[in-house]
Amino acid sequence: MSLRFTKMHGLGNDFVVIDAIRQSVDLTPEQVRRLADRHFGIGCDQLLVVEEATRPDVDFRYRIFNADGGEVEQCGNGARCFVRFVHEQGLTAKRRIRVETRSGIIAPQLEDDGLVTVDMGVPVLEPARVPFVSDSDAIVQPLDVGGETVAITAVSMGNPHAVQVVADVDAAPVAAQGALIERHPRFPARVNAGFVQVVDAHRIRLRVFERGAGETLACGTGACAAVVTVILRELAQSPVRVETRGGELDIAWEGPGQPVLMTGPAVTVFAGEIDVD
């Protein structure tokens, strides 16, 4: 099977984007893993699939597959690339679209300055809906990680995040703790592990160990979850600029019950065609 694709990135968080509207696409988890392999495939953190909408009130369906082949609910950096892709490919003339994901509706918009703003929806804080096993609704929760107790905030941005505040994000044990937190039994759907350093009231630094992908250069939903965390803990105020290893995102959130707005770049790198067997 020959497959046309486009390679894109949002702050170095890179994607293989596939149009499943104008070509037939039915990938197995093993095929996704091969495409995502940086030595034997194209290479990416996630593979994004553009499909026709299944309901009349949205423009497209957006599916996300991690590099390990598993399908996940949401990807913020990918959402920015998604709207740029469908616009550049002539699949829509709209600059603002409504997109269905496994976790609900998002609304990305191409801005005049070339950046993309995405309404990421209202963050979920109730532990059972994250999902996170806890008998408390406290914002800060203790979590045993390899015999050490760390303080985390559990947030879902359509996908689950465990965010901890650290003094120095460069020295944070992202690889060691991130792998343990990702598969912690209190997160039955696994989780993305965020490590955030507060610089001042409107700036934070962030690293994220992503579920199914490991540490990436940037994580859009992770940035949203981190901003929700520091605002809830009264360590920062909206809007917040988030520094990642791949670049910066601007996040605005006015508090519980309100949607999170994320603004950042989306870049097309190259397009190609690959044989998938």
Curated annotation (Swiss-Prot):
Main location: cytoplasm
InterPro entries: DAP_epimerase_AS (IPR018510), DAP_epimerase_DapF (IPR001653)
Pathway membership: Amino-acid biosynthesis; L-lysine biosynthesis via DAP pathway; DL-2,6-diaminopimelate from LL-2,6-diaminopimelate: step 1/1
SUPFAM superfamilies, per database record: Diaminopimelate epimerase-like (SSF54506)
Pfam families for the chain: DAP_epimerase
Localisation per UniProt entry: Cytoplasm
A molecular function GO annotation: diaminopimelate epimerase activity
Binding locations of substrate: 13, 46, 66, 76-77, 159, 192, 210-211, 220-221
EC number per UniProt: 5.1.1.7
Catalytic activity: (2S,6S)-2,6-diaminopimelate = meso-2,6-diaminopimelate
NCBIfam families: DapF
Name of this protein: Diaminopimelate epimerase
Source organism per UniProt: Aromatoleum aromaticum (strain DSM 19018 / LMG 30748 / EbN1)
